[in-house]
Amino acid sequence: MEVTSGSGITVRQPILKAVRPVSNHPSGGFFGAKATGENFARLLEAHPTYIHPASSLCGVYMVSFMSCRQPEWNPDFDYSHLHKAQTRYGIDHGIGGVQHFCPDLNIGLKLGWGGLADKIRHHRQLNPPAAGFYDGLEAVVAGIRDWIRRHAKDARQIARRQDDPTLRENLEAMAGICERIATQPPRTFREACQWLVFFQAAAKMYN
């Protein structure tokens, strides 16, 4: 389907038919941090794992969250007065695109997913009026952690069926790494690389 990319350009994206976003708006769309975070978690829940026995890292992204967001822009905020100029000048306006961001990866590598979850809970208590914002963040982090745990489970299952001892050992190591980084910050170079793979896959999936 055609969607607006994070750069505001119309692109074609595959969809996961198992994903059923929950709307919080009469248009059938969903808007706001809480609904967006919870629906992104639903996408992660449906997203397949990817494990190759000969790779030292697992996890990829296969779809874009934008394919779940229809409409992409809240129709309560009308911009029809801009349509004429947009058409005249062939403007790719980007309205409805989620845009890109530049995260401080050191925070994630230092805290790990468990530490990020703790930080969200801490700041929720300090900012009661922003409950919906923290609901969305918690849903995303919980969804990513579950996605990582599914990789650990699948890697162990593949390892049990693997006859080659080297590949089996690699798969078991991969599973152990995933089990650990789902809750703890990475300790080794390989664990840090695996943490970054999951973060980048989730970030790319989002926008």
Feature roles, as predicted:
Residues 1-126:
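Long, non-catalytic protein-protein interaction scaffolds
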Residues 117-207:
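Structured, charged N-terminal subsegments at the starts of enzyme catalytic cores
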